[in-house]
Structures are given as structure tokens and as C-alpha cells.
């Protein structure tokens, strides 16, 4: 089997305050590209849509551009930037650092299937 899709014709796009997500769905892979503008913060932009106090999505990500700070519910905190690959468990907040747009590729299905999606 060979299956190919392009983000130029994403299966879906979700807009949220100060950002958006584009997703493609393939057999065995749901892939998302999230774009966050300066000033974006999960608790302000997505929490009202998700209805939770912190992000409950599991992420497997690669940062294409920009910087983002992530704070876990247990207080652990770190910053990611271009070229970083990271895994982030449910239960976190995140925000753009600086005045550059942040672009993240997420290979974990839940981001592509449920992130910033109203019920």
C-alpha cells in the first residue's frame, strides 16, 4: 500500500484564537501541523474549546520554527525550539515565546483528530 496526501489540501482545518491546525488522515497515521501566533497560550486560546483546565492531548512533535514553553500540571517546565523533537503527556499548558510564529508537526493521532475541536 502507498498512500500520499498533501497539506496543501488538508482533510480539515481548525481555527482557534491566535492559531490554526491543519490535519491529514491516512491509514494508520493522523498528522497535524499546528501554527501558533505570538501571544498564543493554550489556556487562553484552546481551553475554552476543550473545556478542560489543561491540555489533555498526548503529543509527539517536531518544532519547525519558533519557540514554545511547556508547563506540566506537576510544575515541570521546559522550552522547545527549531529542530527539537519532543513527547508531551496529557496535562500541560503551553505558550509561544517571543514574537515569532511557532509551527509544530505532531505525529500523535489525538492532535489531528481532537485538538481544538468543539464537540
Model-found features: residue ranges?
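Conserved GNAT-family N-acetyltransferase fold
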Residues: 34-36, 61, 86
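Short acidic-glycine-tyrosine-enriched beta hairpin
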Residues: 72-92
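Conserved short histidine dyad/triad with adjacent acidic residue
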Residues: 33-54
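Glycine- and acidic-residue-biased ligand/ion/polar-headgroup-sensing regions
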Residues: 29, 48-74
Amino acid at each position: 500500500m502507498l498512500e500520499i496526501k498533501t497539506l496543501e489540501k488538508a482533510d480539515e482545518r481548525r481555527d482557534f484564537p491566535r492559531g490554526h491546525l491543519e490535519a491529514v488522515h491516512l491509514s494508520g497515521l493522523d498528522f497535524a501541523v499546528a501554527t501558533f501566533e505570538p501571544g498564543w497560550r493554550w489556556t487562553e486560546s484552546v481551553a475554552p474549546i476543550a473545556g478542560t483546565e489543561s491540555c489533555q492531548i498526548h503529543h509527539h512533535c517536531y518544532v519547525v520554527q519558533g519557540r514554545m514553553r511547556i508547563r506540566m500540571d506537576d510544575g515541570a517546565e521546559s522550552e522547545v525550539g527549531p529542530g527539537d523533537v519532543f513527547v508531551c503527556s496529557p496535562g500541560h499548558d503551553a505558550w509561544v515565546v517571543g514574537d515569532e510564529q511557532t509551527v509544530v508537526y505532531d505525529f500523535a493521532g489525538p492532535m489531528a483528530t481532537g485538538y481544538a475541536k468543539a464537540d
